Amino acid sequence: MLYTMRVYALFLLLVMSVFSAEAQFRKITKAPSTENHFLISGVIYHYDIVKGNEMPAAHAQIVVYQNKELYVAFFGGADGTYSFYLPVGFEYEVWFGGSAFANKKLFIDATQLPEEKKPREVTLDVSLFRAVEGIDFSILNEPYVRMEYNPESDSMRVDEEYTRKRKVELDKSLKKAKKLLQSAKG
């Protein structure tokens, strides 16, 4: 009896995951949508802390939360590129990185974005790095970039002052990480 219940429970989980995967696939379609939406695209780079250079990050994970609930998760391309549509009228938190990198978060307030037939486009390149044990990267627990609609320019705009402050803090941690990694190599 217990064995039958376990098999049934596993079967239900399998069926639910198949439907969930299908729904997520539909959400990230790159075909133009008939609903009001905006497009986010760019390149995800892997930043080498020691060498100070970047290269495209193949298959980096992207997780999107809509109004604080999981909306979709997928991987960028082999060349580091990503592109996806999101409906207007919501707040989003987009996590770039997954388990391979220290995650960077993007907060998007699309609640004031006007509804239109044409899609708006946001281009955002993201630089990720691997976490270094012993270095505090808690600065990344909060969004690194904030973006919202600016009616004067009729476009989505990055909060430059907020991002600049976050970058100063992150640069301090990256400098410590570089020093630690270089001293470990001797």
What is each of the regions a protein language model found here?
Residues 1-8:
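Positively charged n-region of N-terminal signal peptides that target proteins for export
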Residues 8-17:
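Sec-dependent N-terminal signal peptides
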Residues 23-39, 45:
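Beta-strand-rich domain onsets/edges
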Residues 24-31, 111-154:
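Extracellular beta-sheet/turn segments enriched in Thr/Pro/Gly and aliphatic residues
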Residues 38-40, 49-67, 149-153:
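Short, ordered, surface-exposed loop/turn motifs in non-cytosolic proteins
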Residues 67-81:
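Short, acidic Ser/Thr/Gly-rich low-complexity loop/linker segments typical of extracellular
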Residues 83-92, 99:
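Short Pro-Gly-centered beta-turn/loop motif in secreted/extracellular proteins
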Residues 95-111:
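A short, solvent-exposed loop/turn motif at the edges and junctions
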